[in-house]
Amino acid sequence: MRDTNLVNGLDGKKILDVTCGSRTIWFDKQHPAAIYCDVRDEECVGVWKSTNRDSERTCIVHPDVLCDFTDLPFPSNSFSLVVFDPPHLRRVGENAWMRKKYGQLGGNWREMLHDGFREGMRV
């Protein structure tokens, strides 16, 4: 059973980003009409080799709602727009910057993406 109390906290927000990560696709990372979801809540700071030189990089993932995009905790038809930008990487090192920044697809990635699309259409 889904948590229907979450619908009370939507406050007119009609955009749902189900895989927000560090919100890199957003110009306004605190858009007032959006709710940001992710399965992670973490801050990563480290030195990763770049094409120019070694540099310190920071990745901050702080979603409004911590959840899995394959099982969203919102009632059906709650949003007008759902943003779905899932991980694209299948093979990447455990500590690689790209993995920290964008996540990684698991072995069941086909089923995961299928279920994610289904949930995005539902909400």
Q: Where do the language-model regions lie?
A:
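Class I S-adenosyl-L-methionine-dependent methyltransferase catalytic core
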Residues: M1-V123
